[in-house]
Amino acid sequence: MVVVDKSQRGVLFGRVENGVYGWFKNGNEKTDRKYMGEISNGLPNGQGTWTHPDGEKYEGEWKDGKESGQGIST
C-alpha cells in the first residue's frame, strides 16, 4: 500500500466575505491575513506562518484552516 501526501506548500489569504471568514488563493497583503505554508484541501494544514497586516504573526501547526497544536504568536 502506498500513501500519498496530498499537501502542498503555498500562499493563502484570509478575510471575511459576506459575513464568513474564508481562505482564498488571491488577496491583498495590505488588508488580508496572509498564510504561507502547507496546504491541503484548500486550507492551511501542517506547518505554516500566518501574518496579519498589523504585524501580528503565528508560526506553527495548522489543521483544517485553524491554529492547532504547537505554535508561537508574536
Task: Give the positions of each predicted feature.
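Intrinsically disordered, low-complexity repeat tracts enriched in Gly/Pro/Ser/Thr and acidic residues
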Residues: 1-74
